[in-house]
Amino acid sequence: MNSCDTKIFDYSSINSFLSENSIWIKNNPCISPDFCLDWVRFTEGLNGTPKLTEYSRSSFFSDYGEWSLVEDRWGDHAWRLRVSDGINEDFESLSNGFETEEYIYFPASFENLVRLKNLLQESDPETNAFPTSRANLGKSTLGIGARFTTLHWDGVDWAMSRLGMGLTANQNSIPRELVYDVNEMLAGNLDTVPFPFIGCDVPEGHQGQSVEGMTHGCILAKFKNGFHKLGISWSFNADHQPIGGKFDKREDQLVAGCMFASYITFDLSPELAETVIPESEEAKACFVDKEVPHDLVDAARKRVENAGLYPSEDEFNGLLAYVWPALQKMKVRDDKYKCFRKKHFSTDLGCDFLRELSIDELPGLTTPETTAVMLALSFEMGMPIHFVAPAFGFQKNIPYPDNH
């Protein structure tokens, strides 16, 4: 990881703000992407008699030695390494190491979380310390929305351990619930997000935690309680990733913040809500002929018919005109997810992610033909879909015909 890369993971502004206002991780986790706000204070404490909480279940081995997780009274965390005999202590693993007579301590920064993921997945491809897309997670899963953070993590881990089954153990809508960029939050630039289920707009990041912070805390919890030793794969869903509309300008930040998510929900509702379908049969045919590659049109038509659906040519052109702008933007976002992960993660396991196609925040019901065309295009465009969420016609707090 070079110096340019580390600037991406510089959260000094939010860490300074939290420290200056005595907002410590112990009582308010997951605001900062880092799980160590004051490394100087932490290391100064090591010079005396360290009063650290040691999480014995967090231990694991790598080629460098034995690692474990420790925490000070403010909630700042560190990775502690007992170096194996014969290992050169100048090895490049995590950053900002502080050496004592017995151990080397590294701050639990988000940058070091990236480094640790690479270190573990390179040395042990079967590790389940981090969210992945493997096992049956792409076929059947249960998404657990994370609303209570510290209460949530241990409860879900306990359930998975008893079931012997991996789940989508952390699920949040971003940027609606989690803060997509802590610097934008500090600058007062967070916007509002449509929330049709309750019939209004809501503030961005209204849960008050960053997507990176929630990711970090969820992973650390699995080390603390020893879940990483159980051999159970689990996933993290970045839910309702908005595609298009006013969210175009922040998509690079969404991509960066969700780099650990092994399950991405592509919410095409914002772009579809703004798309205007040509009115005449001729105009629809002209749009498709001009905008959509002919081989893609033919391949999509074949997939739709193989699903037992036979829209007329005009109906098919209308559907293509409706969904094509959103699918193009989805492809751009998908490529950005893949490129960002390839840049920062060193294994295929670390880069892979599941995809969900979502349009469930549009009013009304999604027709089978609309769903089929969108799925056909997604697969033909190199974006295999694992889950789909069509609009199902139910909106919270809005009268329904049979609601007596």
Model-derived segments and spans:
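Alpha/beta catalytic barrel-like cores
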Residues: 1-343
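A glycine-rich phosphate-binding loop feature that marks nucleotide/adenosyl-phosphate handling sites
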Residues: 174-178, 358, 393-395
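Short, well-ordered, mixed-charge alpha-helical segments that flank or form enzyme active sites
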Residues: 244-246, 272-275, 363-367, 396-399
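Catalytic or ion-translocation cores adjacent to nucleophile or general acid/base/metal-coordination motifs
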Residues: 258-268, 275-277, 379-402
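Gly/Pro-rich turn-and-neighbor structural signature
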Residues: 325-391, 400-404
